[in-house]
Every structure is written in C-alpha cells, then in structure tokens.
Amino acid sequence: MPYEKKAVHFGGGNIGRGFVAEFLHNSGYEVVFVDVMDSIIESLQKTSTYKVTEIGDDGEREFTIDHYRAINSKNEMDKVIEEIATADVVTCAVGPNILKFVAEPVAKAIEARKLDYPIAVIACENAINATTTWRGFIESKLSEETKKNIDSKARFANSAIDRIVPQQPPNAGLNVVIEKFHEWCVEQKPFENGGKKPDVKGIHYVDDLEPYIERKLFTVNTSHATAAYYGHQNKIAYIHEVLQDKKLHDIVRDAVKETANLIVKKHGVSTQEQSDYVEQIIKRISNPVLKDNVERVGRAPLRKLSRKERFIGPAAQLAERGESYQTLLGAVEQAYRFQNVEGDEESVELAKILKEHSPEEVVTKVNGIEKGHALFDPLVAIVKKVQGS
C-alpha cells in the first residue's frame, strides 16, 4: 500500500527496530532504515517482515512490522539524502557518540528539500538534549543562507525515551523482544508557527522536556546502572538477581532516593509522584521476565561516568545544592571497577586511563569535573581507592 507519511530512521539496532520503528509503523509511516552495518541492512532488505514481542508481568503481545525499506549509508549516501529530503520525519537511535557521523546526510537533505513544510528532526538517545547536539553537527554543515531560513526547512525537537530492550535471544535475527512499558516524550514548542508535528501514536508532547529527561535519566538509568555495576562486582549475571539481594536492593533504592530529592526540589514534582515513579521503575528493572544481563546494562562505562550522565549529572547538582550524594558516589566507584569486560571497548579504555593518569586527571578527563567543584575532591578520593586496589 502506498504510504502518505515517511520516516527515515538512522540505526537498525534493537531500539530502532523494536521501539522507534514500531511506533512509526503503527502510526501509518513508511519507515526507511539507514545503517552502516552490512549484516543488518542486508537482513532488512532480504526480509519483508519482522516481529516485535512486548513482554510484561501479564504475558506477551506480538506485532508484525512490514512496509519498510533499508539503505546502507556507507555506499548509497545519495539515496539516503534523497529519502530524507522527501520525508516527514528523521529520527535516530545510534548512540550519542555517533550523532556527529549522521549529521552530513541530514544537512545535505535539508539543503535539497523542496517540500513546503519543514522536516521534523528527533534524536531518540539516552542523553540530555540529544537533538540539540545533533542539530549543532547538522548546522555546522549548512550554508549560511539555509541556516538563516532553517525554520522553513527543519524543526528540531528534543525527546526523552524510556523502554528496556533486554539482551536478545540467540538467533533472534531481526525480531526484537522488548518490555511493554514505554514512554516517548517530545517537546512541542519547535513545531509551533508552521511546523508539522509528527502524528505518532504513543508520543507524549510536552512544553518543557527537562523534567521528563532528568526524571528518566536520573531514575531509570541511575537505578539500572547502579544495579549493573554492583552486580558485576558481586559476580551476579542478571539485574533481577541483583535486586533479589536485600543489601544491593537497598543500595539501588538509596541511589534513587538521592536523585528523587533533586527531581522534587528542582522541578517541583511532588514527593508522592516521584516516589510512585521510583516504585514503578524498581518493579520494572526487577522483572525476571526481562532476563536483563548485568554486563549489557553496564557496558560503555566511560559514557556513563561522563559529566551529564546518570551518576555525575545528579551528583554534581546535589553537591552544588549542599545535598547528600553518598550512594551515587558508591555507584561511581563500582562503575570505575567495570574494567576489561569482554566485548566492551570502553571498559578496556577505562582500565588504560586509570593506569596512565593521576586521580585528578582521571576526574577531569572521565567525569568532566574541574578542580574547585564541590564534587572534585570526593571523586579524586574514589579514583585513588580504585587505582590502589
């Protein structure tokens, strides 16, 4: 069937296929996947459908995803540009570090765009204001003329996504198993005055995204990663098993008690509402049905230890406010101990950095915290401890 709406999505991974494409497909969009991985693109090109299975406490639901196309941007860049230039929406789920590599085709497509309405640009990443970051890379490749009239060609909206994609069963192919719970919040202001807001079932449009992003990142990601790093140190395989250990369960709860204090005081969320949210998250990550692997959740420790991320982001703000952040510091220590894990390049790089640099250099380089900040000395003490053991 011919589709009236088209979305181009960068990233053929599990989040792309199982979350973003599922929402777009169920809202009547033709989805065009773009990736550089030959195996994923070839599989998508050879297969006309794949299945998304949503799992939860109350059983499973299965969806079939079809009417998609796939392009390898490594050798068909012109085609990618043409698809974006004629699309309604362009999204990505590639990892925050890859945004700079998926900017050029979008910039060229914006330059070439002839449609009389702007394309919606939405990054679906686990990072604060990822679309703004992507926009910076895109605009650096635009002509001055296009930059001046950017609103007529493109609208950039930040988003917050929340959905756990556990380790997939072997031989799953393109099929994706994903948790039933989902939240996708998108700012609506960028679509005012001539913008075209994507009509996607399941997107929750909000005026101010920051409370949603910080609530999600500093609750879901903080609790998930805290469980993973403590679990790894205790040689536990799955997240739900970590949370079955009373001592570790209490540590995870204490970490999100500290971040809840920040969310309530900074964003004016009621204590009860945040407490209910925390309960919901602890229940989600404790779900044995997800069989969520500790090493999968812990991977990429350098990114997770960085300045705006799940530990240092809230801990720095709490330190600036003179509030408690001790449990978060404990989680930071465990994250620093996530070294040389098989299949995770960042954990190897982390071990190298700890070996070659002074504690002060490590804190500045890895955590992005400068001398003089209230968090600097406590972090230096943590790094010294890890280096000494």
UniProtKB/Swiss-Prot annotation:
GO MF annotation terms: mannitol-1-phosphate 5-dehydrogenase activity
Record bears the keyword NAD: yes
InterPro entries recorded: 6-PGluconate_DH-like_C_sf (IPR008927), 6PGD_dom2 (IPR013328), Mannitol_1_phos_5_DH (IPR023028), Mannitol_DH (IPR000669), Mannitol_DH_C (IPR013118), Mannitol_DH_N (IPR013131), NAD(P)-bd_dom_sf (IPR036291)
EC nos: 1.1.1.17
One Pfam family named in its UniProt record: Mannitol_dh_C
Keyword Transmembrane helix attributed: no
Annotated protein name in UniProt: Mannitol-1-phosphate 5-dehydrogenase
GO BP term, example: mannitol catabolic process
Biological source species: Pyrenophora tritici-repentis (strain Pt-1C-BFP)
Function: Catalyzes the NAD(H)-dependent interconversion of D-fructose 6-phosphate and D-mannitol 1-phosphate in the mannitol metabolic pathway.
Organism placement in taxonomy: Eukaryota, Fungi, Dikarya, Ascomycota, Pezizomycotina
Key words, A-Z: NAD, Oxidoreductase
